[in-house]
């Protein structure tokens, strides 16, 4: 009996090693729109995530009452959580108008990350590549990071006008190149941190599912869900921090 079990696990392990070659990285399904090549699966994934967020938002805010029910309690907790992030990072005077932006970033990234682990994307076949979390594509994370860059530039210019650019020569003009470089490294760090963590998590789970499909991947999936939530929180927190920094002028 022991020999049979040993043979079974060895055979499963060897078969899994050969299946690892089927784990695709960087495969894309392209759409050609007005002469531009667009990642079709990213658009599909993103719209699915947006529809999920939209449905949950409508469902949980329908028929609001003074004494909240379960679904209303849930959406109030989410709103309070996002509001606290914005208030902490941006400040009590300016945070209110940035709650929608911070909330949009957090919810989109959070649902995108979780969708990669919870939605069985592989049942939907594409001519090339496969569906998955939108945030496992560098184009998505780079786009979100660029939006945050535009947001904190707008926040600084809107509050300070052209005097906003004084920060580049403070406390001394010698730091001008470093201060300019900082504005390029912020979106880079935001995009690559999110992309790297989500892609690595999905690849590790895919490889382990091929090697040991029954036991090992389950706790890793739960760990991945926790990590995905943390990454959404980090992105939203840093976005709020950069916006608050732009308005206050602190480094």
Curated annotation (Swiss-Prot):
Chain segments annotated as transmembrane: 3-23, 38-58, 99-119, 138-158, 203-223, 224-244
Q: How does it sit in the membrane?
A: Multi-pass membrane protein
An example Gene Ontology cellular component term from the record?
Answer: plasma membrane
Look up the coiled coil feature and give its residue ranges.
none
Q: Which UniProt keywords apply?
A: ATP synthesis, CF(0), Chloroplast, Hydrogen ion transport, Ion transport, Membrane, Plastid, Thylakoid, Transmembrane, Transmembrane helix, Transport
What terms describe the molecular function in GO for this protein?
proton-transporting ATP synthase activity, rotational mechanism
- For this UniProt entry, what is the primary localization, expressed as one broad class? plastid
Which InterPro entries does the record associate with it?
ATP_syn_F0_a_bact/chloroplast, ATP_synth_F0_asu, ATP_synth_F0_asu_AS, F0_ATP_A_sf
* Subcellular localization, as worded in the UniProt entry: Plastid, Chloroplast thylakoid membrane
By its UniProt entry, which Pfam families does this protein fall under?
A: ATP-synt_A
Role summary: Key component of the proton channel; it plays a direct role in the translocation of protons across the membrane.
**HAMAP family attached here?**
ATP_synth_a_bact (MF_01393)
In which family does this protein belong, per the annotation? Answer: Belongs to the ATPase A chain family.
Subunit structure and binding partners? F-type ATPases have 2 components, CF(1) - the catalytic core - and CF(0) - the membrane proton channel. CF(1) has five subunits: alpha(3), beta(3), gamma(1), delta(1), epsilon(1). CF(0) has four main subunits: a, b, b' and c.
State what protein this is by name: ATP synthase subunit a, chloroplastic
